[in-house]
Amino acid sequence: MAEEFVQQRLANNKVTIFVKYTCPFCRNALDILNKFSFKRGAYEIVDIKEFKPENELRDYFEQITGGKTVPRIFFGKTSIGGYSDLLEIDNMDALGDILSSIGVLRTC
């Protein structure tokens, strides 16, 4: 069930972030991503509270990404990791270029 839940969301979006809104790292990751203007349907925020039991979902994250924690951030079906990974990409001023290269940003 966890695999289906995750894979359905990854199939429909180019940038997907799995969060828990009470998590400060999740809020920080959302702040970084929300600096950008995404095309409609190219960005999805998934609250992991939507899935029960949560530990099954976290176990699946560990299986496919090596980490159980949130946020779990995907560009397409590729995991870029969590908040610290996103922050590192952003601090290198590479995030905008990456998002542009995968075609998820508005051009206007």
From Swiss-Prot:
Assigned protein family: Belongs to the glutaredoxin family.
List the cysteine pairs that form cystine: 23-26
PANTHER family annotated for this entry? GLUTAREDOXIN-1
Species the sequence originates in:
Ectromelia virus (strain Moscow) (ECTV)
In the UniProt record, the gene name given for this protein reads: OPG075
UniProt function note? Has thioltransferase and dehydroascorbate reductase activities.
- Pfam families for the chain: Glutaredoxin
- The name this protein goes by in its record: Glutaredoxin-1
Keyword Transport tagged? yes
Where, subcellularly, is it found? Virion
InterPro entries documented for this protein = GLR_AS, GLRX1, Glutaredoxin, Glutaredoxin_euk/vir, Glutaredoxin_subgr, Thioredoxin-like_sf
Induction pattern? Expressed in the intermediate phase of the viral replicative cycle.
Q: Which UniProt keywords apply?
A: Disulfide bond, Electron transport, Redox-active center, Transport, Virion
Q: Does the record's keyword annotation contain Transport?
A: yes
> Which is a Gene Ontology cellular component entry for this protein?
virion component
Q: Which residues form the Glutaredoxin domain?
A: 3-106
Q: Which GO terms describe its molecular function?
A: glutathione disulfide oxidoreductase activity
The residues the entry assigns to the signal sequence are none
